[in-house]
Amino acid sequence: MSESALEEVAALSAIYCRDGECEVLSSSVNGITVMIQTGVQGITGSEIHLKLIFDLPVEYPSSLPNISVSSEELTRAQRKDLRDKLVEQAKQHILEPMIHDLVVWTQQNLNNLIVQPEPSILEGHFPLSLDTITEETTWTILLRLDHMRAKSKYVKTVEKWTNDLKLCGRLMFLGKLILILLQGDRKSTRDYLVLQKTCKVDVDSSGKKCKEKMISVLCETILPLKQKRFTTFEVKEYSSVSDLQKEFEAAGLQTIFSEFVQALF
């Protein structure tokens, strides 16, 4: 497998870190098989559970992955239609890591694929292409780190990565809580996750350089076009939960705080 493919699998494990979300089904000289489990709220309000299986050949991403779709809520025809659309999307992004973007595309477009209503019913809203998702939208991701043993070096590394990738946001410290809030385009946030998961950014208990193994993605969402966004990346320390909450509220992210941060205290 290519180094970029192995890095992508590591990044997928970091992004889909909840129990059962991401699983490497097999790994051999012939390639890697990865399963992503996700859910999409249907138009009736009920959740559609999906299992997306990607067989990554040794030549991936120079060769396309083999894709299969499993869901008890979808008919056989709907599963085939979704698979065919994913293959079409994958062909547009040959030579580059694509699995996470294909999952996001599925989450964004599944209901339109199932229902296929008239354009007038959709009021002009059509399925988003991967290009639209990755290049024309701003994403917000919230990460949690367990600890930083080599804090000064770690912070400088994060600052360098965000600067190189033109990401804005905050590295936030409150007691033992460490959060990284990032805003930027899809490719840059994805590239950051790959760096965060695959580079030696800290030291272990013996002082030896090590990769980040205790990171979780708390939230990942598209920022509404009219919502204000961060213009810089800053490292900040807070003295109270109230101060941290005000930071989120000032950025228009109070919902993210209440749904993903408040429960950490």
Swiss-Prot record:
InterPro entries documented for this protein: RWD_dom, RWDD3, UBQ-conjugating_enzyme/RWD
Q: Name one GO cellular component term.
A: cytoplasm
Under the heading PROSITE patterns, the entry gives: RWD
* Gene Ontology BP, a term: positive regulation of hypoxia-inducible factor-1alpha signaling pathway
Q: Which UniProt keywords apply?
A: Cytoplasm, Nucleus
Q: Which CDD domains does the record match to this protein?
A: RWD_RWDD3, RWDD3_C
Domain annotation RWD: ranges: 7-114
**Superkingdom as given in the UniProt entry:** Eukaryota
Subcellular location(s) of the protein = Nucleus; Cytoplasm
Q: What does the entry's domain section say?
A: The RWD domain is required for the sumoylation enhancement activity.
Per its database record, what is this protein's job? Enhancer of SUMO conjugation. Increases SUMO conjugation to proteins by promoting the: binding of E1 and E2 enzymes, thioester linkage between SUMO and ube2i/ubc9 and transfer of SUMO to specific target proteins which include hif1a, pias, nfkbia, nr3c1 and top1. Has no effect on ubiquitination.
- List the protein's name: RWD domain-containing protein 3
Q: Report the source organism.
A: Xenopus tropicalis
* Lineage of the species this protein comes from: Eukaryota, Metazoa, Chordata, Craniata, Vertebrata
